[in-house]
Every structure is written in C-alpha cells, then in structure tokens.
Amino acid sequence: HVDSGKSTTTGHLIYKCGGIDKRTIEKFEKEAQEMGKGSFKYAWVLDKLKAERERGITIDIALWKFETAKYYVTIIDAPGHRDFIKNMITGTSQADCAVLIVAAGTGEFEAGISKNGQTREHALLAFTLGVKQLIVGVNKMDSTEPPYSESRFEEIKKEVSSYIKKIGYNPAAVAFVPISGWHGDNMLEASTKMPWFKGWNVERKEGKAEGKCLIEALDAILPPARPTDKALRLPLQDVYKIGGIGTVPVGRVETGILKPGTIVVFAPANITTEVKSVEMHHEALQEAVPGDNVGFNVKNVSVKELRRGYVAGDSKNNPPKGAADFTAQVIVLNHPGQISNGYTPVLDCHTAHIACKFAEIKEKVDRRTGKSTEDNPKSIKSGDAAIVNLVPSKPLCVESFQEFPPLGRFAVR
C-alpha cells in the first residue's frame, strides 16, 4: 500500500491544534533526535501513540482530538491500525465525515487508485457504511513535478471526482484541498507556494461553503441530525456490579433517549426492569441522547443475567428483539478463497461478537446499484457483494440498516 501520508497529515493536525501536551511533545522530540530521526516529523507523533496503544497502555484519548474554530474533532482511524475496518463497521466509531488522503507524487496517486489500491476500497467502504460527507486532501504537493503543480492537482481532482461519483458521492459537495502534511501547506493556513489555488468550494442543499485550507474544510462539515426521535437502542459494552448501587450496564445511546424511570427491556434475553438513574462522566443525567456513553443503574437484575452485546430499548416503544436468522447485504473485502453456503465465521455487530452461519447465499448484486446480477450463486469471493441469509449460533439483536444504522452494520472475521 502506497503511503499517502495519512499519519503525517493527522499527526500535524493533532500536533498543531490538539490534545498533545508540551511535555509529551518534548519527550517525543528528544527521542526522535536520539534515534537519529533528525528533524522531528508529525507521523512520529502518531507512531508513538499507536505503539503505546498497541502495548495496551490506554492513552489519554484527548490525544486523538483536536479543535477547530467550530468543532472538537475526534480522529477515529489512527491510519493503518489493523482494526480500523472492523471498528468502522461495528460502529465503535461512527464517523460524521471521511477525509480521503491521496498522494500527488508521480506514480503514487496511480498506485493508490489502481484497481486494487486502498484509496478506492476506503472510499467505497466509507460510503457503504453511511459516511456521506467527504473531504479530499491531495497530499505531498511538495513532491509533484514540478513541485506544487497546478496541473497535477487538477488531474487528480478530475480522476478522484469521477470515481467517487461512481461510488455515490456528489463531487460538487466535496472539498478538494491541495496540501503538504509534511510542510504544512494549506493545513491550517493558506500556502504561499500555490498562488494558483483560489480555494475550495462546495455546494449542497444546506448551503455553500468555501475556504483555502484543510482545517476550514473540516469546519464546513454539517453536523449530523442525532436520531433522538427514534426508538431507544443502547448496545451494552459492559455490565458492572457496583457496591451499594447494584447492577450498572454501560454503553452508548445509538438512537432515542434514555432517562430515569424508563422501563427498559434487554434483547435478546427479554429481561425487563426499571432504570433508577443514568450517569455520564460521574454526573447524574436527566436524559441521555445519541452519542452519550453512559452507565445506568437497573433494579432487580443481576450482573450474571446481562452481557456485552445485549441491547437495551424502551419496553413500551418499538422494543428490540433477538433474531433467529436475518437477511443482509454482505460485501467480501479481503477473504482468501471462495465462500459458500455453510460458511460460519464470527460476526461483530455493534458490541456483539457471535458465530453466524451463511445459511443461504441468495443472490450476487452490483456493489454500487444493489441490482441483482446472479441468483443462488454457488459461492462468492473477494470484491463480491451478495444478499445472504445468516443464522446466528444464538439469538442476536440486529436491526434494519434503514431504521437503526448502528445495529444494521456488521463485520465478519
């Protein structure tokens, strides 16, 4: 995979606008010098954070955030992290916007966008998973021929526009920004090296926006409507027993509202109980809304009866239920060999982790249009999309993607 400079770009933003304290930076800079990394580079920041995270040192999550004039931005993909795709699909991390970084260097862009390049795969995946806002950073403008070449930028913009359009994005609503994550051109302020660049501009039904640099493009993201009007769905991440309080399930409200007094049902176990109190960051809440990570105390239910992967809902309003089987659209990303009826992988859906059998592969479909291309195929392979009937080894709480997206997405491992 060609390195498009995601880490450097991300590192630069975190470094300049973000949550890394002075002490940590000085420590990193010193280490970089000792290791002969000479000039301290932004990707190094990210490498350090990733290494610490992979060793199981929980890093202060503030490190993965930075601020713009308008938003707190949380970086979900520490690029190259092996669980990225799984995390993206299971919605442990649902993004509001994707930033696609393509390398402008000679040959680099072509490799990334080639038939099996990762640029394509990531853009398609983002769209398929419902990340409908996109920004394109045309990176490494310092290494074009000649450096900071307008014609190279325009060539890439044209090519990327045409293929994101095929995927389903509207290029007119996508900001294309020529940048150098290494030197900082057009990252936080307009570059003097590209006088030809008059700025990016986007048009969408919610209005127009324009600007010069990447950080302004992030500021122009439209905040998504949080689904408070839908029925409550809260997948459990953990369940604790807390002395003097009792049983406390913990998870993120995906849709609807949770408040004290709600009579909740836990699916698929079908256990019903009253919510006594709701807490976030050690403070009592009168109501929790989508996006809130909360703990809530429930009456007369023991820790043993609940588990990660169960889903809490309101017993009186469209409650969740377990499914003995379900039909889903499956896209095969990277799987060696053929998959046929009877294949039983482990499925990750919201917080549930459970073996599921491909009971019947009903049809192959076109990944972009969803139109059927073959009925009852013998098998499917990497790159294929299919409609499959799945049977979980024990009941699983899934929902239609249309109604409850976070509970209608899954990854198969």
Swiss-Prot record:
Q: Which GO terms describe its cellular component?
A: cytoplasm
Return the InterPro entries for the record.
Answer: EFTu-like_2, G_TR_CS, GTP-eEF1A_C, P-loop_NTPase, T_Tr_GTP-bd_dom, TRAFAC_GTPase_members, Transl_B-barrel_sf, Transl_elong_EF1A/Init_IF2_C
| PROSITE patterns attached to this UniProt entry | G_TR_1, G_TR_2
Residue ranges of domain tr-type G in the record: 1-228
Pfam families found in the cross-reference section: GTP-eEF1A_C, GTP_EFTU, GTP_EFTU_D2
Its predominant location is cytoplasm
Name its cellular compartments. Answer: Cytoplasm
Which SUPFAM superfamilies does the entry link to? EF-Tu/eEF-1alpha/eIF2-gamma C-terminal domain (SSF50465), P-loop containing nucleoside triphosphate hydrolases (SSF52540), Translation proteins (SSF50447)
Q: Where does GTP bind?
A: 1-7, 77-81, 139-142
UniProt keywords (A-Z) are:
Cytoplasm, Elongation factor, GTP-binding, Nucleotide-binding, Phosphoprotein, Protein biosynthesis
Q: Where 5-glutamyl glycerylphosphorylethanolamine occurs along the chain?
A: E287, E360
- Function field: This protein promotes the GTP-dependent binding of aminoacyl-tRNA to the A-site of ribosomes during protein biosynthesis.
Q: Which NCBIfam families match?
A: EF-1_alpha, PRK12317.1
User: Which protein family is it in?
Assistant: Belongs to the TRAFAC class translation factor GTPase superfamily. Classic translation factor GTPase family. EF-Tu/EF-1A subfamily.
Q: What is this protein called?
A: Elongation factor 1-alpha
Q: Which organism was this protein described from?
A: Heliothis virescens (Tobacco budworm moth)
Instruction: Give the taxonomic lineage as stored in the record.
Output: Eukaryota, Metazoa, Ecdysozoa, Arthropoda, Hexapoda
